[in-house]
């Protein structure tokens, strides 16, 4: 590992610490929102990624298999955090649990077969890459076909869904290209170049992602405010209609 790669990994770890702080602020701001408990799981995304990058900076989990270097913690990070990224998009869309589980599974299998393609060679490498690509396309079908059908007619919720979907969608187009151009693929770029690009993409994918939830938290708090207002209106109506001694 070069000094540049090690430094990039440490910078990424610090950036994810910032992301963890953002999720803590979001949790505090949500107050009585019924989404508060579920959205607390967002902390896993920057938290786990930060630990993984700290480990990568220390050289933990990097192994050589069949002459190919596999940065194990990178793939462990991806297989834990990226299903959460796409799963929460489905949650914001109001998709069914089955659909959310489907997109998370497609994402995890995409990563798993991609890791398999790194440590194999010849025809098998490209077969595994092809299978990974199929799950990649399946993931996009969920994001751009299945989930939009479930989004309620609420401007804030629809806006947050669109933002998250396009943010992740655009970045997910870059990852297979970097893999293909790097040592695991056709070897057009060096391992250092691929490592630096992956670190940049990971930070760009995850830290702004949790910030978007914080910046648009009204999509969740307004639901609570509306419900509270309805209860207060109902209470007032009962009070106004109740008989008094004068009656």
UniProtKB/Swiss-Prot annotation:
The keyword Transmembrane applies. InterPro entries: Arc/bac/fun_rhodopsins, Rhodopsin_retinal_BS. It is found in: Cell membrane. GO terms for cellular component: plasma membrane. Gene3D superfamilies: Rhodopsin 7-helix transmembrane proteins. One of its GO terms (biological process) is phototransduction. Keywords: Cell membrane, Chromophore, Membrane, Photoreceptor protein, Receptor, Retinal protein, Sensory transduction, Transmembrane, Transmembrane helix. Residues 1-4, 58-71, 120-123, 183-190 are extracellular. CDD domains: 7tm_SRI_SRII. The modification N6-(retinylidene)lysine is found at residue 206. One of its GO terms (molecular function) is photoreceptor activity. Residues 27-35, 94-96, 152-154, 224-247 are cytoplasmic. It is a multi-pass membrane protein. The chain crosses the membrane at residues 5-26, 36-57, 72-93, 97-119, 124-151, 155-182, 191-223. It holds the Pfam family Bac_rhodopsin. Interacts with HTR-I. Belongs to the archaeal/bacterial/fungal opsin family. Involved in the control of phototaxis. Mediates both photoattractant (in the orange light) and photophobic (in the near UV light) responses. The signal is then transmitted to the sensory rhodopsin I transducer (HTR-I). This is Sensory rhodopsin-1. The gene is sop1.
